[in-house]
């Protein structure tokens, strides 16, 4: 899969004209089929029922208009409180990094701030723990802060990962930007763009060098392969290049990768960043486990009721 690099960011390549035409035609066919199903359902109804359904559809239209206003007001409210959160996040960052001392601290302390704060906060989350490998941990100990913000042009949101100077890569900040499009008043992921990491020689965590022994008279054969790493988060799934054909299996795999990538982003944005200390102390883990257990208990009670009804 080829990628273009510009201004330190990996740019996704566009679909070929042929692939675009195929996708557009497929989408048109699906929409046409849905429209025909809609008409078929209405025409199959008795006249009196059809009139009632027409009224229900008008009610739905009124609901949809209110829903649009809801999303607009929700976005404005989120923007308002994001600004109010800012000073709190800034103070948190200063305490974690040791820039701001806490009242009552003794002078006899071995280390500043809260070591491995973000590493442990992320590792305590089930989704992110699957992405963090043992080889990543030393590099993530240099993670100083994580921030996110909404962007308007294009619409979406952006992450910034701030790092101390470290032996793994040159970048002080790694970014990941998600471009969204509105579809039926719901934001849908269009593409994601990540920073190209400038690895120091011999420290790249997203590749591994494999060595194969050859005959005694020749040197060992070495080759480089991609490997699993948290830092692959900054190289998001991309559309295949112009030379590739998007078959059904490839499209499904790409869709799964993009959904997984967005799950990670949502977890960082909605859980880790706003509640970092709760994840660090594992309090958030207990809350999630309790919530899951409560749901399971509810389902078991429902099943018991069903069996009781059947026996009765």
Swiss-Prot record:
List the keywords (alphabetical). Answer: Chaperone, Coiled coil, Cytoplasm, Nucleus
Question: Where in the cell is the protein located?
Answer: Nucleus; Cytoplasm
Pfam families, per this entry?
A: NAP
Coiled-coil stretches are 24-78
Q: What are the GO cellular component annotations?
A: cytoplasm; nucleus
The record ties this protein, via InterPro entries, to:
NAP-like_sf, NAP_family
SUPFAM superfamilies per UniProt = NAP-like
Give the superkingdom in one word: Eukaryota
User: Which stretches of sequence are listed as region Disordered?
Assistant: 288-312
Keyword Cell wall biogenesis/degradation annotated: no
GO molecular function: any one?
histone binding
Q: Which GO terms of type biological process are on file?
A: double-strand break repair via homologous recombination; nucleosome assembly
- On whether Chaperone is a keyword of this UniProt record, the answer is yes
Which parts of the sequence form the motif Nuclear export signal?
45-60
According to the UniProt entry, the note on domains is: The acidic domain is probably involved in the interaction with histones.
> Member of which family?
Belongs to the nucleosome assembly protein (NAP) family.
Q: What does this protein do?
A: May modulate chromatin structure by regulation of nucleosome assembly/disassembly.
| Name of protein | Nucleosome assembly protein 1-like 4
């Amino acid at each position: 899969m080829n990628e273009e690099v510009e201004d330190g960011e990996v740019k996704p390549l566009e679909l070929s004209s042929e692939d675009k035409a195929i996708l557009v035609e497929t989408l048109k066919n699906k929409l046409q089929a849905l429209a025909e199903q809609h008409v078929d359902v209405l025409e199959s109804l008795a006249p009196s029922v059809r009139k009632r359904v027409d009224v229900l559809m008008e009610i739905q239209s009124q609901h949809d208009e209110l829903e649009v206003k809801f999303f607009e007001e929700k976005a404005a409210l989120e923007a308002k409180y994001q600004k109010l959160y800012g000073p709190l996040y800034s103070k948190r960052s200063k305490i974690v990094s040791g820039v701001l001392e806490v009242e009552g601290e003794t002078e006899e302390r071995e280390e500043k701030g809260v070591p491995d704060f973000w590493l442990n906060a992320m590792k305590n989350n089930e989704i992110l723990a699957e992405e963090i490998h043992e080889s990543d941990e030393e590099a993530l100990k240099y993670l100083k802060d994580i921030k996110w913000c909404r962007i308007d042009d294009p619409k979406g949101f952006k992450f910034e990962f701030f790092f101390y100077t470290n032996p793994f890569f040159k970048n002080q900040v790694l970014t990941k930007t998600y471009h969204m499009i509105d579809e039926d008043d719901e934001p849908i992921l269009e593409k994601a763009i990540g920073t190209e990491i400038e690895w120091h020689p011999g420290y790249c965590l997203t590749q591994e060098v494999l060595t194969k022994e050859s005959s005694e008279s020749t040197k060992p054969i070495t080759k480089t392969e991609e490997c699993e790493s948290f830092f692959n988060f900054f190289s998001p799934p991309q559309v295949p290049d112009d030379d590739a054909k998007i078959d059904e299996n490839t499209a499904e795999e790409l869709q799964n990768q993009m959904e997984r990538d967005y799950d990670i982003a949502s977890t960082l944005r909605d859980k880790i960043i706003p509640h970092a200390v709760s994840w660090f102390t594992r309090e958030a883990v207990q809350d999630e486990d309790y919530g899951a257990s409560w749901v399971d208990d509810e389902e078991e009670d429902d099943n018991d009721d069903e069996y009781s009804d059947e026996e009765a």
